[in-house]
Curated annotation (Swiss-Prot):
GO cellular component, one term: mitochondrial inner membrane
Subunit structure: Complex I is composed of 45 different subunits.
Family: Belongs to the complex I NDUFB2 subunit family.
Intracellular or extracellular location(s): Mitochondrion inner membrane
Entries under InterPro entries matching the protein: NDUFB2_animal
PANTHER family: NADH DEHYDROGENASE [UBIQUINONE] 1 BETA SUBCOMPLEX SUBUNIT 2, MITOCHONDRIAL, NADH-UBIQUINONE OXIDOREDUCTASE AGGG SUBUNIT
UniProt name for this protein: Probable NADH dehydrogenase [ubiquinone] 1 beta subcomplex subunit 2, mitochondrial
Known role: Accessory subunit of the mitochondrial membrane respiratory chain NADH dehydrogenase (Complex I), that is believed not to be involved in catalysis. Complex I functions in the transfer of electrons from NADH to the respiratory chain. The immediate electron acceptor for the enzyme is believed to be ubiquinone.
Length: 160
């Protein structure tokens, strides 16, 4: 029966022979490499302005091809790009973003003005008929008229 140490050394030697380990056996010693040539072949995925496999005439067309609106300040979008950053936001992206933000702000403003209780919570709002005359400061009908402190005989605007 083989010992554990021998099995570990054998596995280490196999990994070194395949080029997956560097000379120093460390925790991060597995080499990460780029895939080139036939290793890099993968599924046909939408990349760039074209969609689908190149031999598919239904998906791989120039119909509806959008390369950005150059007159509105967009950079032209290439047919294909690989391992490059995106060209930035296009005019359509900016318009859709502006429209969505305008709708959200309109909804928020409308509801803050007309239905603020939905956003801030409800509180009890009593009817005016629930208050008594005494709470509102209204004298009884049988009470004598209060003395009026007015300026009856003076011209308007001269008594202040």
């Amino acid at each position: 029966m083989l010992g554990n140490k021998f099995v570990a050394q054998l596995a280490l030697q196999q990994l070194k022979n395949r080029g997956l380990l560097t000379s120093a056996p460390r925790l991060t010693s597995v080499r990460h490499r780029f895939a080139w040539g036939s290793d890099a072949v993968g599924p046909n995925v939408p990349v760039g302005g074209k969609m689908g496999a190149s031999e598919n005439p239904e998906l791989h067309t120039y119909d509806g091809d959008y390369r950005g609106t150059i007159s509105k300040g967009d950079k032209p979008i290439p047919d294909y790009f690989y391992r490059t950053p995106t060209t930035g936001r296009t005019y359509i992206d900016r318009c859709v973003t502006y429209f969505i933000s305008a709708v959200i702000w309109a909804w928020f403003s409308y509801h803050m003005y007309y239905h603020s209780g939905h956003l801030l919570g409800h509180w009890y709002m009593p009817y005016l008929t629930e208050f008594s005359d005494e709470e509102l400061g209204i004298p009884k009908d049988s009470a004598e008229d209060p003395e009026y402190w007015g300026n009856h005989k003076k011209e308007y605007g001269t008594y202040r």
